[in-house]
Each structure stands twice: as structure tokens, then as C-alpha cells.
Amino acid sequence: MGKLTVVGILTLFIFYIVAASGKCTAPVNCPAGWKKYKTNCYFFSPDGKNWHDAAKQCQTMGGYLVKITDSEENSWVVDMITKSVKHKYGYWMGMADLKNEGDWRWVNDSSAVSYSNWHRGQPNNANNEDCGHFWSAVNYEWNDIVCNTDQMGYIC
């Protein structure tokens, strides 16, 4: 086998590995009314709902309640919240401990919450609080609250 053939095969192999790893992705175009951050699109609701209805609305729009993976993303979301419609209690996020108390999971993929930004003393499960939200009273740090709290904003 000639050097040119070996180089060609190696080039194709490397291209395949890079493509398979997902590092070569097309640019993300978000629907009208959605905001782009890195490779994701986010929707900040102008209306309020309880957690279950908010989750259904996100699914209807082709998404899910927001999953926060790191402090940088959290900071960006909080910045966007401060520029959005204000809701009395804050905004729903896509985590809950509905199945096992204290076992906070992201509802889109059931993964455990690893990064968090809980307000001091939270989550405390007062009154059976099983759903997570960005709490407006404490600069949008995280809090657990009763899932049927109405008029909470939501982020998909």
C-alpha cells in the first residue's frame, strides 16, 4: 500500500471519529421567541403556570423544562430572567424529587442533579415541596416549592 493510500485512509478514519463524537455540528437556529445560548435554545415564558402544566407546555413546543449543567449556564439564565417578564415567585426549572424525597433529578433524562445553586437552607421540603425553581425573592437562587404553585414563570 502506498503512502498516499495510507494517508487517505487515516484522514477518513480521523474524520469519522470526529464526526461520530459530535464535535462537528451544524449551527443552531432557534425558533422565533427563543434565545440561543451555546448550542441550546431557551424559551422564557411570559405567562405563568404550575410545574406540571409548564412541563407539558414545554413538551408541546418540542422542548422540556430547563436543565442547568454549570454555573456559567446558570448565570446566563439568571441574566435573561432579569431581562424578562417578572413573575411573583420566579421561574420553574426541570428538576424535581417527585419519586424519592431528596433525590433531585432532571426530568428530561432522569439524570441526578450534579451542579446546583440552592439558596442557603434549601431544599428543605417544607409543605412537601418537590419541584425546583429560580426563586425571585433571593436573586433567583434555587429553591424547592410545591409543584402546584400557580402563576410561576417557566423556562424551556
Curated annotation (Swiss-Prot):
Domain C-type lectin: 37-156
Keyword Hydrolase (UniProt): no
Primary subcellular site in the record, as a coarse category: secreted
Record's signal peptide: 1-22
Source taxon at top rank: Eukaryota
CDD domains: CLECT_DC-SIGN_like
Pfam families in alphabetical order: Lectin_C
UniProt KW Secreted keyword: yes
Tissue-level expression: Component of the organic matrix of calcified shell layers like nacre and prisms.
GO molecular function: carbohydrate binding
Subcellular location: Secreted
InterPro entries documented for this protein: C-type_lectin-like, C-type_lectin-like/link_sf, C-type_lectin/snaclec_domain, C-type_lectin_CS, CD209-like_CTLD, CTDL_fold
Annotated disulfide bonds: 30-41, 58-156, 131-147
GO CC entries: extracellular region
Keywords: Disulfide bond, Lectin, Secreted, Signal
Protein name stated in the entry: Perlucin-like protein
Species: Mytilus galloprovincialis
High-level lineage: Eukaryota, Metazoa, Spiralia, Lophotrochozoa, Mollusca
